[in-house]
């Protein structure tokens, strides 16, 4: 990824506490959707144009489906072409 394509790069602390309100068997899935919606709302991008790194997904699923982390610190890279990448810092 050349540097000229990056329009914005920030590190965000993303709260995932809302996932605890869903059923125990859906908490990790809910955390992924909360992550997408949070980044979409803050950076004003469409949720279909958000790419989540597999390592971020592994971090959420690390302790299993029922116990996702309550918050994550992630690096968000917004590209000029309109897509947004979510990676670990």
Swiss-Prot record:
It comes from the Archaea. This is Large ribosomal subunit protein eL31. One of its GO terms (cellular component) is ribosome. SUPFAM superfamilies: Ribosomal protein L31e. It comes from Thermoplasma volcanium (strain ATCC 51530 / DSM 4299 / JCM 9571 / NBRC 15438 / GSS1). Belongs to the eukaryotic ribosomal protein eL31 family. GO terms for molecular function: structural constituent of ribosome. SMART domains: Ribosomal_L31e. CDD domains: Ribosomal_L31e. The keyword Protein biosynthesis does not apply. The gene is rpl31e.
